[in-house]
Amino acid sequence: MTQDATPSRIPTLAVTLGDVAGIGPEITAKMLLGHDELRQRARLLVVGDAAVLAQAVQAVGGDPARVRVIATPAEATNQPGSIEVIQAGPSLAHVPPGQLSAEAGDGSVRYVTTACALARDGLIDGIVTAPLNKAAMHMAGHKWPGHTELLAHEFGVKTFSLVLSAGDLYIFHATTHVSLRQAIEDVNPQRMRAVLRLAGSFARALGRADHPVAVAGLNPHAGENGIFGTEDAEILAPAVAQANAEGILAAGPIPADALFPQAVRGKWKFVIACYHDQGHAPFKSVYGDDGVNITVGLPVVRVSVDHGTAFDIAGKGIAREDSLVLAAERAAQLAPGWHQVWETARSTTGG
C-alpha cells in the first residue's frame, strides 16, 4: 500500500484498459478528460496502451497530446485533463475495434497482471477495471472464467466473491462464471459458510455489522419445505445458523423473488445470491449500468464497470463512461480502509 492511502492523502488507482477492441479505451479517455473532480479523491493512471488511448482520445474529440507514458506510478502528476499511461507490452493500435482478437484478449490479461504486480509491490492502492472480453481472452489461451478469477489467482486467494453494488446495496455471489448446473453443485456447505463469513467481515469492516446478511433461496419459494428441493433446508439454513452462532448477523434462506425487491427498497444492505443470474438479473433490471462490481477477498480494492465490451458500438465514441466513473469513485472511497476489509476477511475465512 502506498503512503497515499491514508486519511490525509488520496489513494493511487490503476485503471486497466480492458479489451482494446471494445469500449474500454474510449470510456477511459472520457473519464480522464471529463471528470477532473475524481482527481481530488484519487491519483489516476492507466495500465494499458498509450497509442490505443491516443486514438480513443481523438475519437471522442480530445487532444491526443494529453496522453503521456510514465514508467512508474510515482511519476504520475494527476494533472487535470492528463492521461498518464504505464505501457504494458507492445502496442495494439492496429487491432480493429469491434472484432474478437487473440491479441486484444492477451493484452487485456497483461494489463490486469501488470496492475496486480504493481499492487503486490505496494505501488498502487487499488485497481479499476474496464471490461475485457472472455472469448478473446480464451482465444489467447487464457482460460479464466473472468476478471474475478484471474485477480484471485494473481493474489493467491481462494475465498473471494463478486459483489454488485449500487448505493448502499451489496449483492455477493456464492458462485459466478459457471453453468447453472455447476452452480447448483457448487452451492455446498463449505462455500456458503465461506461467503457468509466474507460478507459478514465486509459489513463489519464498513461499520455495519448490525445489518444482517440476507441469503437468497436457491430453489423457488426457498424450497417450500422440501417440495421444490432440499438444498435450502439442508445447506443454506444450516450455514445461516452457523453464521449467527459465529457472531455474523444473517437471515434466510429467503425466497429470491421476495428478497430482491425488499433489498432494492432498502430493507437489506448485504445480500448473497446463489448463482450469477440470480443476482445480476434483478440488479441490472433496476440499476442498468449505474452500478459497479467489487471483488471482496483481495488484498487491494478492485472495482469494475458492470457492463461488457460492447463491440457493437466500440470505436464510435458514443459509449457512456458513467459506470467507470462510479467504479473509480467507489474504489477511491474504499481504498483508504481496505486494509481492514482484507484483514477482517482473511482472519474469518483463512484467505
Swiss-Prot record:
Family matches, as SUPFAM superfamilies: Isocitrate/Isopropylmalate dehydrogenase-like (SSF53659)
Database matches in Pfam families: PdxA
Cofactor: a divalent metal cation
Segments traversing the membrane: none
Binding site for substrate: H147, T148, K284, N293, R302
InterPro entries: PdxA_fam
Residues annotated for a divalent metal cation binding in this entry: H177, H221, H276
Keyword NAD found: yes
GO molecular function, one term: metal ion binding
EC number assigned by the record: 1.1.1.408
Domain of life assignment: Bacteria
PANTHER family in the record: 4-HYDROXYTHREONINE-4-PHOSPHATE DEHYDROGENASE, D-THREONATE 4-PHOSPHATE DEHYDROGENASE
Function: Catalyzes the NAD-dependent oxidation and subsequent decarboxylation of D-threonate 4-phosphate to produce dihydroxyacetone phosphate (DHAP). Can also use 4-hydroxy-L-threonine 4-phosphate as substrate.
Protein family membership: Belongs to the PdxA family. PdxA2 subfamily.
Name of the protein in its database record: D-threonate 4-phosphate dehydrogenase
Organism: Bordetella bronchiseptica (strain ATCC BAA-588 / NCTC 13252 / RB50)
Lineage: Bacteria, Pseudomonadati, Pseudomonadota, Betaproteobacteria, Burkholderiales
